[in-house]
Amino acid sequence: MEELIAKRYATALSSVSKDVKSIASVLNVLSEAISVPEVHEALTSPIVSAEKKTDMILSAIGKEADATMVNFIKILGENKRLDLIPAIAKVLNADLQKESNQYEGVLKSSSELGKEELAKLEKTLETYTGSKIELKQEKTDLEGLRVSVDDLGIEVNFSKQRVKEQLIDFIKKSL
């Protein structure tokens, strides 16, 4: 439900704004600020008035902010939707990635890959999808590799355990 509402706000914002990239970057910064527990608590608190919440966000973006951005924040405040800023930022980022045909993905593994190996993997994914994909590495206790690009709906998993199981099944079937 939240994503549907955020999508409508993001569509409206991108239709009236000339520079969607700068607005998306401001919303990304606001999203990080909202992820701080104290700020999130203030935004979702029924005790704090909607005007104070709006003023808090407006003071965070500063006086030199774009008029479109200021009006957008005021509309979100009037409709008590300031807590949707992270979701709106996510939708705008996804739209910008789709527009530029560049996506971000996550590579999860127990050990870090070298820059050359990572570049090869990115090149392979680019050939497969036709889109430029930039992978960020995350270290996990997973034995193997997991590559996911959420905006494209891609998830590839290579685990030692799964390969072992498939090899055993293949040997059993061949006997």
UniProtKB/Swiss-Prot annotation:
Under the heading Gene3D superfamilies, the entry gives: N-terminal domain of the delta subunit of the F1F0-ATP synthase (1.10.520.20)
What InterPro entries does the record tag this protein with?
A: ATP_synth_OSCP/delta_N_sf, ATPase_OSCP/dsu
**One GO term describing the cellular component:** proton-transporting ATP synthase complex
Location(s) in or outside the cell: Cell inner membrane
Transport as UniProt keyword = yes
- Indicate whether Zinc appears among the record's keywords: no
What are the record keywords, sorted?
Answer: ATP synthesis, Cell inner membrane, Cell membrane, CF(1), Hydrogen ion transport, Ion transport, Membrane, Transport
Single Gene Ontology MF annotation: proton-transporting ATP synthase activity, rotational mechanism
What is the protein's membrane topology class? Peripheral membrane protein
Entry's HAMAP family?
ATP_synth_delta_bact
Subunit text: F-type ATPases have 2 components, F(1) - the catalytic core - and F(0) - the membrane proton channel. F(1) has five subunits: alpha(3), beta(3), gamma(1), delta(1), epsilon(1). F(0) has three main subunits: a(1), b(2) and c(10-14). The alpha and beta chains form an alternating ring which encloses part of the gamma chain. F(1) is attached to F(0) by a central stalk formed by the gamma and epsilon chains, while a peripheral stalk is formed by the delta and b chains.
Functionally, this protein is described as follows: F(1)F(0) ATP synthase produces ATP from ADP in the presence of a proton or sodium gradient. F-type ATPases consist of two structural domains, F(1) containing the extramembraneous catalytic core and F(0) containing the membrane proton channel, linked together by a central stalk and a peripheral stalk. During catalysis, ATP synthesis in the catalytic domain of F(1) is coupled via a rotary mechanism of the central stalk subunits to proton translocation.
Q: What family does the Swiss-Prot or TrEMBL record give for this protein? A: Belongs to the ATPase delta chain family.
Protein name, please?
ATP synthase subunit delta
Native source species: Sulfurovum sp. (strain NBC37-1)
